[in-house]
Amino acid sequence: MIKNLLNKRKYITVSSVELNDTELSEDEKPNIPSGMWSKCEKCAKILYTEDLRENFNVCPNCGHHFKLGAYERIKYLTDENTFVEFDKKMIGRNPLDFNGYEEKIKGYQKKSHVIEGVVTGEAYIAQRKVVLCVMDSNFMMGSMGTAVGEKITRAIEYATKNRLPLIIFTCSGGARMQEGIYSLMQMAKVSGAIYRHGRENLLYITVLTNPTTGGVTASFAMEGDIILSEPGCLVGFAGRRVIEGTINEKLPDDFQTAEFLLEKGFIDKIVQRKDLKQVITSLLRMHEVDYE
């Protein structure tokens, strides 16, 4: 008996290879709902998606700002149930008969749950009425085509007519190549509407989000009276490799970041997403004018 007590207990060993090769049946597989967990693109930490949403879609570990859909951003920013959307059914056409373009638009509409690359409308922020344009990178990387340009222009004209402050959240890969020159002309059209809005001494705030590039950067993104940005945003016109290849020089590591632009005086302030509503409210209050 004593001998048995002193003997080491023996275990049946199973190799990890055998375990890894074993196929679990459907009943044995863990039932984890799709979308329950998210992985941070910067620090690779696995995050509970509900906690991430409660933290404004910002990683609590490293502060990385996840991409936000247009309607999510509007929900975070505006007073509850005050947003009224403009031109809800306006979608892009295919002016150049670009092969497969209509199918691509339909695919992105299904995938992103928006019908175009921008959502526009009016809402209240801290009980102050504003006009909002929020670009959505989930739809063709927020590229600017005729529908995007037209929706933004109409929203600006509405703000001008009703003497309202204008806030545009930019997020774009630039002009939409499938629409060619029709896409490029939106830069001038939107900029003209911005000019007329400014001529009436009305406030225009831009908020740069990741990424803001190409024709959007070269036009209305950098025309705001006040230019804010979320941390770590890519902001530029041409791509890094294109510039380095053209000038045959190595660019700084922080080139085309919001922090670099702040240092050089191109933007006014970098704001954490959780603080955006408070900062914008303060700006609206400072520039408040009674026109009656």
UniProtKB/Swiss-Prot annotation:
Belongs to the AccD/PCCB family. Its main location: cytoplasm. A zinc finger (C4-type) spans 40-62. Zn(2+) binds at residues 40, 43, 59, 62. Keywords: ATP-binding, Cytoplasm, Fatty acid biosynthesis, Fatty acid metabolism, Lipid biosynthesis, Lipid metabolism, Metal-binding, Nucleotide-binding, Transferase, Zinc, Zinc-finger. Binds 1 zinc ion per subunit. Gene3D superfamilies: 2-enoyl-CoA Hydratase, Chain A, domain 1. Its cofactor is Zn(2+). Residues 36-292 form the CoA carboxyltransferase N-terminal domain. This is Acetyl-coenzyme A carboxylase carboxyl transferase subunit beta. It catalyses: N(6)-carboxybiotinyl-L-lysyl-[protein] + acetyl-CoA = N(6)-biotinyl-L-lysyl-[protein] + malonyl-CoA. It comes from Clostridium perfringens (strain 13 / Type A). Pathway: Lipid metabolism; malonyl-CoA biosynthesis; malonyl-CoA from acetyl-CoA: step 1/1. Acetyl-CoA carboxylase is a heterohexamer composed of biotin carboxyl carrier protein (AccB), biotin carboxylase (AccC) and two subunits each of ACCase subunit alpha (AccA) and ACCase subunit beta (AccD). It is found in: Cytoplasm. GO terms for molecular function: acetyl-CoA carboxylase activity; ATP binding; carboxyl- or carbamoyltransferase activity; zinc ion binding. One of its GO terms (biological process) is malonyl-CoA biosynthetic process.
